[in-house]
A protein has these predicted regions:
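Histidine-acidic metal/acid-base catalytic patches
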Residues: 1-8, 12-27, 90, 100-102, ...
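Catalytic-core regions built around general acid/base machinery
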Residues: 47-59, 134-141, 199, 236-240
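Active-site-proximal loop/turn and secondary-structure-junction residues that shape catalytic pockets
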Residues: 10-12, 35-37, 68-71, 110-112, ...
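Glycine-rich, proline-tolerant flexible connector loops at the mouths of alpha/beta enzymes
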Residues: 33-56, 111-114
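Active-site acidic/histidine proton-transfer and metal-coordination neighborhood
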Residues: 15-18, 57, 74-181, 235
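Hydrophobic residues within beta-strands of alpha/beta enzymes
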Residues: 31-32, 63-65, 104, 149, ...
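Metal-dependent catalytic neighborhoods of phosphoester/phosphodiester hydrolases
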Residues: 42-48, 77, 82, 261-262
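The substrate-binding groove and active-site-proximal loops of carbohydrate-active enzymes
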Residues: 37, 75-83, 187, 228
């Protein structure tokens, strides 16, 4: 079974339809739609119908969407901000359902660069409470539309909560597995200096998605390299995913091309790697 997918995030210099063309040409059966980067508002009516036709014409399955990030998060530090973004996330849950996706990726907390008074010592507590309120609002909506929200580990060097699988696992255990899971971003693990094997084990059976890319440093921007172009041990990674009986998609999210390499060539390189790595 070919359980691979490729993120449109890998095509920053292309429209969403051009990204779909390249993903299809590279041989992937499924795609993760980057919302915010490629679709900034949920499509409706004729635009929605046309987009579904574009997916079908390329024989691509929209396996997941990535909700807008940046300001759009569960753990906003003011109630006005939180309500606004929870409403945005609800609208994208509906969009995910409308295009036949099963999962939506969410950043649980904001990047400190977006947080007013980012060093406020009360921020961790404020964020924890905000995340809970947002999830209490969104879980019934996700259930209604048949979408699972997957919370992503994040590469922020700060004292905010919910940046690792270890922390996120404790959070998602409080909610139904059909509506809330985890997505492991491998590059973010590397940026944070965490151990990929331990993060996978911490996620365990609540791991429902992956963002697969390599990393060669501990700063934002050191990740999103092609597989085996950084420091991650991909054999150990796959072995551990098999040990926890991971059955979700293998979604590749490389963005950084090498010199004179196009975005489509990076997707093809990654596809070649995936076929060997996963024995497709």
């Amino acid at each position: 079974m070919d359980n691979t997918s490729y993120s449109t995030a890998g095509f920053r210099n292309k429209s969403v339809l051009e990204a779909l063309d390249s993903i299809q040409k590279s041989g992937y059966p499924s795609v993760e739609i980057g919302c915010g980067s490629h679709i900034d508002q949920p499509l409706k009516n004729a635009d929605l119908n046309n987009f579904n036709k574009e997916l079908k014409s390329r024989n691509l399955k929209a396996r997941s969407i990535h909700a807008p990030s940046g300001l759009t998060t569960l753990g906003a530090t003011t109630e006005e901000w939180r309500i606004k973004e929870a409403t945005t996330l609800a609208s994208f849950i509906i969009f995910a359902s409308d295009i036949g996706a099963s999962d939506m990726v969410i950043h649980p907390i904001p990047n400190p660069i977006f947080v007013p008074d980012a060093d406020n010592p009360n921020n961790p507590s404020i964020m924890e409470k905000a995340v809970a309120r947002s999830l209490d609002y969104l879980i019934p909506i996700a259930e209604k539309y048949g979408i699972r929200m997957n919370l992503e580990n994040l590469p922020y060097h700060c004292n905010y909560p919910y940046r690792s699988m270890k922390e996120l696992r404790l959070l998602v255990e409080q909610y139904p597995a059909d509506q809330l899971g985890l997505i492991l971003d491998t590059g973010h693990v590397g940026v944070m200096g965490d151990e990929i094997v331990e993060e996978i084990k911490s996620a365990g059976d609540r791991l429902k998605g992956t963002h697969l890319h390599d990393v060669n440093g501990n700063q934002d921007g050191d990740d999103h390299k092609g597989p085996n172009r950084g420091i991650l041990n991909w054999d150990d990674m796959l072995k551990t995913l098999k040990e926890i009986q991971y059955s979700g998609p293998y979604t590749f999210e490389p963005i950084v091309t090498q010199e004179n390499e196009t975005e489509e060539e990076l997707a093809i390189f990654t596809r070649t790697f995936a076929k060997t790595w996963l024995s497709i």
